[in-house]
Amino acid sequence: MAKENLPIVFGPVLSRRFGKSLGVDLSPSKKQCNYNCIYCELGKAKPIERMEEVIKVETLISTIQNALNNLTTPIDVLTITANGEPTLYPHLLELIQSIKPFLKGVKTLILSNGSLFYEPKVQQALKEFDIVKFSLDAIDLKAFERVDKPYSKDINKILEGILSFSQIYQGQLVAEVLLIKGVNDSANNLKLIADFLKKINTARVDLSTIDRPSSFKAPKLSEDELLKCSLFFEGLCVSLPKRSTAQAKKLVSCGIDELLALISRRPLSAEEAPLILDPNAFKHLETLLNHKQITIKKVGSLEFYCAF
């Protein structure tokens, strides 16, 4: 899908999960991706192996530097993305190494589908980022092909790449799992994903469903269904979409020992806690913190209550 006159740099925009972000689009004029995801809001496009239109790295660097110099408000993060997959950009390492020196107190983030993490050149570039967010919508091969419609269907190679990168990466590794009703929300697929993410140093799992117009017909999960799916990710910091007022009224009442057991199974986001815990249960959090039975872990702009 061609897009005319779209800027390379956009924002700042406020991200609930990462704070105030200035975005950088490595493919502003055209969708260039090795996936053709069922939920993609950019429209349908044939998946490609390599970028066909490549912006000069010097152009990107000067454009980013100019945008940073003209900011009127502070930002938390510089986000590298694309109308497609940013790790397809052949000069990614040079780009990130060139812009980091003039980022003062600003974290760097890249949004990727994770498909090329096995490539040494891609790994070298990704190591330079403070936060790497990758997608993992399916491990079950049939679900993977239906959801992501990839150029390469070698899911094992993709998983090996993510695993090997996680072993050398020192920053925050965030996984995104987008679920579509009747496609990749089976117990088998969820267990496969959760088991894999527990093997790697995943700082946070962003679990979501369809919330925007997509390329193909893609039914969304309800808030209750998404919450049930999150139970598969026991022991991981899971971020769910912000709850509606109706959902927020369903408060949990529990004693301090029950609350500690709950947090031991699944870390609780600080944003979610006042929405799902009744006032008495919410007060137990302070007691558990004071007794050093739980701690607060920050991932991006989100905080989680975690057991020691």
Curated annotation (Swiss-Prot):
CDD domains: Radical_SAM. Pfam families: Radical_SAM. PROSITE patterns: RADICAL_SAM (PS51918). Keywords: 4Fe-4S, Iron, Iron-sulfur, Metal-binding, S-adenosyl-L-methionine. InterPro entries: Aldolase_TIM, GTPase_Obg, rSAM. Binds 1 [4Fe-4S] cluster. The cluster is coordinated with 3 cysteines and an exchangeable S-adenosyl-L-methionine. The keyword NADP does not apply. [4Fe-4S] cluster binds at residues 33, 37, 40. Disulfide bonds: none annotated. Residues 18-247 form the Radical SAM core domain. GO terms for molecular function: 4 iron, 4 sulfur cluster binding; catalytic activity; metal ion binding. SUPFAM superfamilies: Radical SAM enzymes. Its cofactor is [4Fe-4S] cluster. PANTHER family: FEMO COFACTOR BIOSYNTHESIS PROTEIN NIFB-RELATED, UPF0026 PROTEIN SLR1464. Belongs to the UPF0026 family. This is UPF0026 protein jhp_0109. It comes from Helicobacter pylori (strain J99 / ATCC 700824) (Campylobacter pylori J99).
